UniProtKB/Swiss-Prot annotation:
SUPFAM superfamilies membership: VC0467-like
NCBIfam families: PRK00228.1-1 (NF001266)
Signal peptide range: none
A Pfam family this chain is assigned to: DUF179
Organism field: Shewanella loihica (strain ATCC BAA-1088 / PV-4)
This protein's GO CC annotations: cytosol
Protein name as catalogued: UPF0301 protein Shew_1144
Superkingdom of the organism of origin: Bacteria
InterPro entries for the chain: AlgH-like
Length: 185
C-alpha cells in the first residue's frame, strides 16, 4: 500500500454527501490501520480570534490572515481542535507530517497565534475526517476521491471558497469530464 499521507483528497463532483460535497481534505495520516485528515475548505463562521476568546485564552494576539477562519475539519470529534502549520519545534503534542507541515493538538500553539512565536502559516480546524482499515482505498477505487500531492500554496494562500476549484484545476484535466463509474466503458 502506498501511503497518501501529505496528499490532498479532492471530492469528485458526483459525491453528493452533503458533508463532503466539493471538499478538499489534507491527509495527515494514512497507514494499514486507516486514515485521518482535515477538510481545508469549510469555514464554520467563527474566526480564530473568537475561538480563542471562547476558550478564555487571555494571552492571545489578534490575527489577521486568510486562514483566520476556523474550519470544519471533519465529522469526527468536532469538539477537538487541530492546528495544521508550518514547522515550529516548541509545542507539545506536535506531529511532523512532512518537511513542510506539522499537526499540533495542544493549547500552547493557539496562544502563540498572532505573535512572533506563531507558525508562519496555519489552519485551525475542529474535528477530523477518519477512515477505517481499507475504507479510503475502497472510496478511491469507487471514484469518490482523487488525490494529489499536498500543495502548500493552495492550502495556505488560496481563499477557502476557491480551494476545491483550484485543486481540480491543478489536475490538468476537466474533472467534470470524468465518469463517476469505475471500470465501465
Amino acid at each position: 500500500m502506498d501511503s497518501l499521507q501529505n496528499h490532498l483528497l479532492i471530492a469528485m463532483p458526483s459525491l453528493k454527501d452533503t458533508f463532503f460535497e466539493r471538499s478538499v481534505i489534507y491527509l495527515c495520516e494514512h497507514n494499514e490501520q486507516g486514515a485521518m485528515g482535515l477538510m481545508i475548505n469549510r469555514p464554520i463562521g467563527v474566526d480564530v480570534n473568537e475561538l480563542l476568546r471562547q476558550m478564555e485564552l487571555d494571552d492571545f494576539h489578534t490575527i489577521e490572515s486568510i486562514n483566520s477562519k476556523v474550519l470544519v475539519g471533519g465529522p469526527v470529534g468536532q469538539e477537538k481542535g487541530f492546528v495544521l502549520h508550518t514547522p515550529q519545534p516548541q509545542w507539545s503534542n506536535s506531529q511532523q507530517i512532512s518537511d513542510d507541515l506539522m499537526l499540533t493538538t495542544s493549547r500552547d500553539v493557539l496562544t502563540s497565534l498572532g505573535s512572533k512565536e506563531a507558525p508562519e502559516q496555519f489552519i485551525v480546524a475542529l474535528g477530523y475526517a477518519g477512515w477505517g482499515r481499507h475504507q479510503l482505498e475502497q472510496e478511491l477505487a469507487d471514484n469518490t476521491w482523487l488525490s494529489i500531492p499536498a500543495n502548500i500554496d493552495l492550502m495556505f494562500n488560496t481563499d477557502h471558497e476557491s480551494r476545491w476549484q483550484k485543486a481540480t484545476e491543478s489536475l490538468g484535466f476537466d474533472i467534470w469530464q470524468l465518469s463517476s463509474q469505475a471500470g465501465h466503458a
